[in-house]
């Protein structure tokens, strides 16, 4: 297979055929006597018929809903993932919002439990203690004296 003129031995050259309808050139102007049925229909109706493979926007509509409401939900999701729950003020804010939701959903007479004492990170994230544990080698002496729980990190008393 020979390479076309102007192409080096390692270059790939592709011939791309563009439909005449896309170039707005009729078959008479190019001297091509072979006419397609699509071109004949286009001349009869007066409405350009899009060639296959081309996207043609005929009408614009407003979006069905605002994207901003979705962005708010994703921003809150990111906020909860990246929030340091060891900060007591932030923990209280999240706990208060959970208490409000539970109070509206709980039947009368039942008191919702306070969740401020046990805040759990979402299952799709890892706690910092777990990330640090993965980075440290198993023979590290600091790691041996620490128990990692899903709710909180507690250090065992060291014996002297």
From Swiss-Prot:
Signal peptide: none
Pfam families named among the record's database cross-references: Dysbindin
InterPro entries referenced in this protein's UniProt entry, alphabetically: Dysbindin
Highest taxon above the source species: Eukaryota
Annotated Basic and acidic residues bias: 127-143
Keywords: Phosphoprotein
In-chain residues carrying the UniProt-annotated modification Phosphoserine: 3, 97, 121
Entry GO CC: cytoplasm
Coiled coil (residue ranges): none
Region (Disordered): 95-160
Family the UniProt entry places it in: Belongs to the dysbindin family.
PANTHER family, sorted: DYSBINDIN DOMAIN-CONTAINING PROTEIN 1 (PTHR16294:SF4), DYSTROBREVIN BINDING PROTEIN 1 DYSBINDIN (PTHR16294)
Name of protein: Dysbindin domain-containing protein 1
Species the sequence originates in: Mus musculus
């Amino acid at each position: 297979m020979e390479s076309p003129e102007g192409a080096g031995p390692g270059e790939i050259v592709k011939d791309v055929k563009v439909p005449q309808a896309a170039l707005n050139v009729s078959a008479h102007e190019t001297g091509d006597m072979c006419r397609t049925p699509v071109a004949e229909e286009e001349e009869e109706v007066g409405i350009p018929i899009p060639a296959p493979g081309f996207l043609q926007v005929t009408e614009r509509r407003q979006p069905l809903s605002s994207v901003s409401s979705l962005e708010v939900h994703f921003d809150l999701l990111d906020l909860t993932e990246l929030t340091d729950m060891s900060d007591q003020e932030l923990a209280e804010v999240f706990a208060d919002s959970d208490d409000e939701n539970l109070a509206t959903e709980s039947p009368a007479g039942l008191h919702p439990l306070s969740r401020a004492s046990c805040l759990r990170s979402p299952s799709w994230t890892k706690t910092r203690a777990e990330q640090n544990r993965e980075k440290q080698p198993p023979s590290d002496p600091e790691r041996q004296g620490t128990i990692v729980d899903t709710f909180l990190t507690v250090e065992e008393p060291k014996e002297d």
